[in-house]
Amino acid sequence: MSKLDEMTAYLPPFLTKLKEMAELLKAEAPEFEKQNNSIFDLTDQLFVTTATWGLERWEKILNVPRESGDTDEIRRLRLISKMSNIPPATYRAIEHALNRFLKNPSAQVRLLPGEYRFKVDIDIDDMQHMSELIETLENMKPAHLAYTLRAALNEPLQIKDTVILNNRRYRKASELKVGYSVTLNNNEVVLV
């Protein structure tokens, strides 16, 4: 329904038949349409997920630097990451925050108890926003923990190799005689 039809529906029928009222509605309907669009656009700027030209204000409020070449989507993700950083951070919260930057959510956080660190495995195909991933990790991780960020393959690898294991025992200097070999025994095992 157009704005003209909407405004006409609010009026009593006898007013809609007047030529002056029809002309007035034709002139004012586009202006009301522009005003409504401006109101909706302004309302969109109040939320990070829908903001466009208001992202700059959000970045200023949250003290998030803008980098050249950033798309609106990356800027939004960076802002959401900053806003959702509520301590204490669990490994699942860190995984969830990192997966926002990945095409295929593949981040896996594994705690290493007793070592005061954790490791983060991310599929090597999803490593396109590396600086954002590191920044998110630095912002979310507890201060006393270190981390290792590793690019991982999401495919099983099968390694085939042959290993030859030699267990040689040599003679002592006092046991050496002419004609004897230097080795006392030579056990060789082939592992496939």
Curated annotation (Swiss-Prot):
Check the record and name the InterPro entries matching this protein.
Answer: Phage_Mu_Gp48
Cite a single Pfam family from the UniProt record.
Phage_Mu_Gp48
Family statement: To B.subtilis XkdU.
Specify the protein name.
Answer: Uncharacterized protein YqcA
